[in-house]
């Protein structure tokens, strides 16, 4: 019985370790992430890819910052070889009506000012971008 108990404990530890490794996320450092900006028609998309191809990225948007800015927090995690990931990177986009008006997520229109800032949170720093500056699809 002792051998069975030890085997069960070892299997549980290995399973727990593998599960933690592939499900535990972290905020990546800025030097680990490639960020691109692309404009297709009126839609500007920011794309975030980890330089390590075995790491997938997700992005979470937070409107509730104290200064009223929009904040993207990136999250990285190891790619699980047992699950097919639909995408490697994280994406966030704006639909511009013109250079100073965008559609909000609820479909309403919003006039942009110089105070409308997008903050991208990395482990080592925050990058601030004026949303108006994204209208041409360049960073």
Q: Residue ranges of each PLM-predicted region?
A:
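Polar, acidic low-complexity tracts enriched in Ser/Thr/Gln/Glu with frequent Gly/Pro and Thr-Pro motifs
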Residues: 27-139
């Amino acid at each position: 019985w002792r051998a069975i108990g030890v085997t069960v404990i070892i299997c549980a530890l290995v399973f727990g370790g593998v599960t933690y490794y592939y499900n535990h996320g972290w905020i990546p450092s800025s030097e680990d992430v490639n960020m691109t900006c692309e404009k297709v028609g009126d839609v500007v998309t920011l794309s975030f890819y980890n330089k390590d191809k075995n790491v997938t990225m997700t992005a979470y948007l937070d409107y509730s910052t104290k200064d009223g800015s929009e904040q993207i927090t990136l999250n990285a995690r190891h790619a699980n070889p047992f699950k097919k990931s639909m995408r490697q990177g994280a994406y966030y986009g704006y639909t511009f009506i013109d250079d100073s008006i965008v559609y909000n997520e609820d479909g309403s229109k919003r006039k942009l000012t110089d105070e409308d800032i997008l903050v991208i949170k990395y482990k080592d720093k925050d990058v601030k971008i004026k949303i108006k500056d994204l209208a041409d699809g360049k960073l």
